[in-house]
Swiss-Prot record:
HAMAP family: ATP_synth_c_bact. This is ATP synthase subunit c. It is found in: Cell membrane. It is a multi-pass membrane protein. Belongs to the ATPase C chain family.
């Protein structure tokens, strides 16, 4: 059961991270097309937001490894 739980955690974390990054990039592109003069600011915010969105899946994958280690 532990290996299955670890696989589910890793899979859901990867999907969640991909969706979060896609939403952040989509919103940044929409913002730049509406207001091109804010490109630098929006790009900076995107470069801050993407690692924050990826931190949660990385933590979840580490938790999956911990679950796998205890199995």
């Amino acid at each position: 059961m532990g290996l299955l739980g670890a696989a589910i955690v890793a899979g859901l974390a990867a999907v969640g991270g991909a969706i979060a990054v896609a939403i952040i990039v989509k919103s940044t592109i929409e913002g730049v097309t509406r207001q091109p003069e804010l490109k630098g600011t929006l790009q900076t915010l995107m470069f801050i937001g993407v690692p924050l969105a990826e931190a949660v899946p990385i933590i979840a994958i580490v938790m999956g490894f911990l679950i796998m280690g205890n199995a």
